[in-house]
């Protein structure tokens, strides 16, 4: 399917830029006059795209007029949007490209031309989520050799041998593991449960590795472990038009999107238009800080955009956020982010655009803005937009942007009134205006279980103690008063330490949110420098790591001279990509694990990301806090979160003098000076060279050269999915859901991590059994995220999260009841039995079903389990779109009702029918086997969603377009 022809209806608006016939644009302000002038900047971008793509079919003149009349039409109409480009990361990119490959097969089978199946817009796929930390500071973990790759071919790692003497770890006293093999035996059990039949030298290390080699070794293993996936990506870049793959080791999707792919203004042939983007990564919103409209959507919707269809959204309300005042000296952009997050959550901006204006905006750098914009999914907004202004232009100039293009960009943006100027006499009109005084924001962290639970650093000690007292919940651990002062001794690396409630055991500056912000990274480095120089250290049992977003972070930390000091404190670079943040953390030492279990301690992880859903880091780490990078370092030095930084010292110097946090906290002037000297130009130049040159391993990787992908039936990574098995040229009539059983009875805030985990594959899981039956050992399982190209693994991994709370079971476990037999089984095993019996399934849930990361397998998995509908109190929008996009009906209880109020136990049998004529918000009647009947709302927002559902989902709908 070709993309729509531009401007059929509004060709008369095309003008040349300053008389240059090679630079044309749609002069949209002429269309609306004063109506245009009061539009928020973000809505002006939507309007330009509508005008440019108006062909009377996919984009109608009525849609354009609705956007122009935003003031009266907001929240009341659906509008299409054609983004300029698409960005994928590999965790969600691989199922998207596998679906494309499978669609080619289906189109050919039904007599169509498979060559027509390719993206209609530029699509960039960044391989950034496959990194796992096999090699850390002091040694090499025995890395897996999965069925999909050969580690010896990938990196020719030297054989691992048992040694009878202590391994010479760099720094000796700062080794992160107990490396005295004399105290351990092969059968002692002091090694990771994910590593079998390997020499036991220390809990998670084997060979000593110099720091620079650590990154290379992790990359070697990454290429070996993911060889099949990488070959498939390389085939995709050659087989499909408009697909470019950014290879491993380059950086994260949102990082590369911001620093390399972003154009601000597109110049296609002779036409100028605003850059805009959608992608399968929730952090895609980061680019809004650069004045580029963009947000995260599901993999299924992204595929539709790639095939030339628009994204459809309700014309959003736009909340104007006026920033005033100046930030305090000790406040980082992360504190500003968390302050805005809490404020916007309280105001309520779900499903809305947020647009920033006011005098305070000009005081924020681009990296500050992108950090704020990156967090918008956490407060529920679709996006948070910072219009282009002089700060943006200066940033682009410093990053080496071509000056001629920069001049054209400025002229174009001013011509179409997309350039924000503090001297403007009037601001756009907004649906609502809120004010935030930057001076009122104080340093804070977020936790212990949810990112929205913000805690001022000054209140941290009292808040943690309150959490110990509270009943088990989002802010409670219910530790008996007489147990709260308990300590447990742990012997580590020849020394004795005490663990207690609040002890920090994981401290990670990870590759999410913060690494794009040089100021906070440099602040962490400066803090480390001052700490080391004054004699402070991190206790060796704390699992510390530094996982940068891209190579330029390493560059500026190194060139500024702070990297060695971070290393001295244990924050060594372990690789480039998502690791700790997606559950790929290396295990803690056995000594620490035993101590935690012995004392039933509430130990803590402190990380500089933006997500910390329960159980994500490590099962034994019950409290997890989000903090700015310098605070991560500070809490690591303190060794506990149960501390008042204002009144209690971090430690003592060599003379015994007490050292407080304010003694080593870097000033904003120090940070900004270092940022200017070591960051701006070189970091972007480095990434550009890295992306364009690739790397030796990627460049030498062989891939098939064919229109159709040659599926390997033995592959455990890439498999042709079954979504198109029953595809016909015409859709069948909607079928009723009759005599359905409830597969799971869930509560509130069920996340996509609960539904479709991205981390490691547990040995006892259904997915593990599948892989074992195909000859793989536990060391070769890899992660669910890495195996999203295999529908058999992902279906078995659906609802396999150990933290899943199913009310049928009464405790966290990936289990359910198969009611016909009364057996308690793994969720997959129960669903498999139901399918053999021909019994359809539904899911009962509470509020905010499907919250968290955008993850299309959280819909695909239940679909392949046989789930026909989900009945919940409310949904996360992206996940609801996914359910419709795969053919699952999203049903909602009537306002004020839920399963409890209706007296449902979940053990009933449910039946409902769909009328031939569906419409948005239609009420349906459900009958149960007990005789009880009740009404629910079919949560379809528009006719497009209804059409997709009738086709059996978006994939079937799109595939039929090629026939």
UniProtKB/Swiss-Prot annotation:
Example of a GO cellular component annotation carried by this entry: cytoplasm
**Any keyword Manganese?**
no
A Pfam family of the record is Aconitase_C
Main subcellular location of this protein, as a coarse class? cytoplasm
Q: Which UniProt keywords apply?
A: 4Fe-4S, Cytoplasm, Iron, Iron-sulfur, Metal-binding, RNA-binding, Ubl conjugation
Record carries keyword Zinc-finger:
no
Record text on cofactor binding = Binds 1 [4Fe-4S] cluster per subunit. [4Fe-4S]-binding affects RNA-binding activity, thereby inhibiting activity of the protein.
Q: Name one GO biological process term.
A: post-embryonic development
State the coiled-coil residue ranges: none
Q: Which GO terms describe its molecular function?
A: 4 iron, 4 sulfur cluster binding; iron-responsive element binding; metal ion binding; translation repressor activity
Q: How is it modified after translation?
A: Ubiquitinated and degraded by the proteasome in presence of high level of iron and oxygen. Ubiquitinated by a SCF complex containing FBXL5. Upon iron and oxygen depletion FBXL5 is degraded, preventing ubiquitination and allowing its RNA-binding activity.
**Compartments in which it is found:** Cytoplasm
Q: How does it assemble?
A: Interacts with RBCK1 only in iron-rich conditions. Interacts (when associated with the 4Fe-4S) with FBXL5. Interacts with CIAO1 and CIAO2A.
What family does the Swiss-Prot or TrEMBL record give for this protein?
A: Belongs to the aconitase/IPM isomerase family.
- By what name is this protein known? Iron-responsive element-binding protein 2
Recorded source organism is Mus musculus
Q: Which gene encodes it?
A: Ireb2
């Amino acid at each position: 399917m070709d993309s729509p022809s531009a401007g059929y209806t509004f060709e008369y608006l095309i003008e040349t830029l300053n008389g240059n016939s090679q630079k044309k644009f749609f002069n949209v302000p002429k269309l609306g006059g004063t109506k245009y002038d009061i539009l928020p900047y973000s809505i002006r971008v939507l309007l330009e795209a509508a005008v440019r793509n108006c062909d009377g079919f996919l984009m109608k003149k009525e849609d354009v007029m609705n956007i122009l009349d935003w003031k009266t039409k907001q929240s009341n109409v659906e509008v299409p949007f054609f983004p300029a480009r698409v960005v994928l990361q590999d965790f969600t990119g691989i199922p998207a490209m596998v679906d494309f490959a499978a669609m080619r097969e289906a189109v050919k089978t039904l007599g169509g031309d498979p060559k027509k199946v390719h993206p209609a817009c530029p699509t960039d796929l960044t391989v950034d989520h496959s990194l796992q930390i096999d090699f850390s500071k002091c040694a090499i973990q025995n890395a897996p050799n999965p069925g999909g790759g050969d580690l010896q071919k990938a990196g020719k790692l030297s054989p691992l041998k048992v040694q009878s003497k202590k391994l010479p770890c760099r720094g000796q006293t700062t080794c992160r593991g107990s490396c005295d093999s004399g105290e351990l035996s092969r059968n002692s059990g002091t090694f990771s449960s994910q590593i079998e039949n390997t020499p036991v030298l220390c809990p998670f290390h084997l060979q000593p590795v110099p720091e620079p080699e650590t990154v290379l070794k992790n990359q070697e293993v990454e290429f070996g472990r993911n060889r099949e996936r990488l070959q498939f990506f390389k085939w995709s870049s050659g087989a499909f038009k408009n697909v470019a793959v950014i290879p491993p080791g380059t950086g994260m999707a949102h990082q590369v999107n911001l620093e390399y792919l972003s154009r601000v203004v597109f110049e296609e042939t002779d036409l100028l238009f605003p850059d805009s983007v959608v992608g399968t990564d929730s952090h895609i919103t980061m680019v809004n800080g650069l004045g580029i409209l963009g947000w995260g959507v599901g993999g299924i919707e992204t595929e539709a955009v790639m095939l030339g269809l628009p994204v459809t959204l309700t014309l959003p309300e736009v909340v104007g956020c006026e920033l005033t005042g100046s930030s305090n000296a000790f406040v980082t952009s992360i504190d500003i982010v968390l302050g805005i997050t809490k404020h916007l959550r309280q105001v309520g901006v779900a499903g809305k655009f947020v647009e920033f204006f006011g005098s305070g905006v000009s005081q924020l750098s681009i990296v500050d803005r992108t950090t704020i914009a990156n967090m918008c999914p956490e407060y529920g907004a679709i996006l948070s937009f910072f219009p282009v202004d002089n700060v943006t232009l200066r940033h682009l100039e410093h990053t080496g942007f071509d000056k001629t293009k920069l001049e054209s960009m400025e002229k174009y943006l001013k011509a179409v009134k997309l350039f924000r100027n503090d001297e403007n006499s009037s601001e756009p009109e907004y649906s609502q205006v809120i004010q935030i005084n930057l001076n009122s924001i104080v340093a804070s962290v977020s936790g212990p279980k949810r990112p929205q639970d913000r805690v001022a650093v000054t209140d941290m000690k009292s808040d943690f103690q309150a959490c110990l007292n509270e009943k088990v919940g989002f802010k409670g651990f219910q530790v008996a008063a007489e147990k709260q002062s308990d300590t447990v001794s742990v012997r580590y690396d020849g020394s004795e330490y005490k663990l207690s409630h609040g002890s920090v055991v994981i401290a990670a500056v990870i590759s999410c949110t913060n690494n794009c912000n040089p100021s906070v990274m440099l602040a962490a480095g400066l803090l480390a420098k001052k700490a080391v120089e004054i004699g402070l250290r991190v206790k060796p049992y704390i699992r510390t790591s530094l996982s940068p977003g891209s190579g330029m972070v390493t560059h500026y930390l190194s060139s500024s001279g702070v990297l060695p000091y971070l290393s001295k404190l244990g924050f060594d670079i372990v690789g480039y990509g998502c690791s700790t943040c997606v559950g790929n953390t290396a295990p803690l030492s056995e000594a620490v694990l035993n101590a935690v279990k012995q004392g039933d301690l509430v130990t803590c992880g402190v990380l500089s990301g933006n997500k910390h859903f329960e159980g994500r880091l490590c099962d034994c780490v019950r409290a997890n806090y989000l903090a700015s990078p310098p605070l991560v370092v500070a809490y690591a030095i303190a060794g506990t979160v149960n501390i008042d930084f204002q009144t209690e010292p971090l430690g003592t110097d060599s003379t015994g003098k007490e050292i407080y946090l304010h003694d080593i906290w870097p000033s904003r002037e120090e940070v900004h000076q270092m940022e200017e000297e070591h960051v701006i130009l070189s970091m972007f130049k480095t990434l550009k060279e890295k992306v364009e040159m690739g790397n030796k391993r990627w460049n030498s990787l062989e891939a098939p050269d064919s229109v159709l992908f040659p599926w390997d039936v033995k592959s455990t990574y890439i498999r042709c999915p079954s979504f198109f098995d029953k595809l016909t040229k015409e859709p069948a009539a909607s079928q009723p859901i009759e005599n359905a059983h409830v597969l799971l009875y869930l509560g509130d805030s069920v996340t996509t991590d609960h539904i479709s985990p991205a981390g490691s594959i547990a040995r006892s899981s259904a997915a593990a059994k599948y892989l074992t039956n195909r000859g793989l050992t536990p060391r070769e399982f890899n992660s669910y995220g890495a195996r999203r190209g295999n529908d058999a693994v992902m279906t078995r991994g659906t609802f396999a999260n150990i933290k899943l709370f199913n009310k049928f079971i009464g405790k966290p476990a990936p289990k359910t009841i198969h009611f016909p037999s009364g057996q308690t089984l793994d969720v997959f095993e129960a669903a498999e039995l139901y399918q053999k019996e021909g019994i359809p399934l539904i899911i009962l849930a509470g509020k905010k079903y499907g919250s968290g990361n955008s993850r299309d397998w959280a819909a695909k998995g239940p679909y392949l389990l046989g789930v026909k509908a989900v009945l919940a109190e409310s949904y996360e929008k992206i996940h609801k779109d996914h359910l419709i996009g795969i053919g699952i009906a999203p049903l909602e209880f009537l306002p004020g009702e839920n399963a409890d109020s209706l007296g449902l136990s979940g053990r009933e049998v449910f039946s409902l029918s769909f009328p031939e004529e569906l419409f948005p918000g239609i009420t349906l009647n459900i009958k149960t086997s007990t005789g009880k009947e009740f009404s629910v709302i079919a949560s379809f927002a528009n006719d497009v969603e209804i059409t997709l559902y009738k086709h059996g989902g978006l994939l079937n709908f799109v595939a039929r377009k090629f026939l």
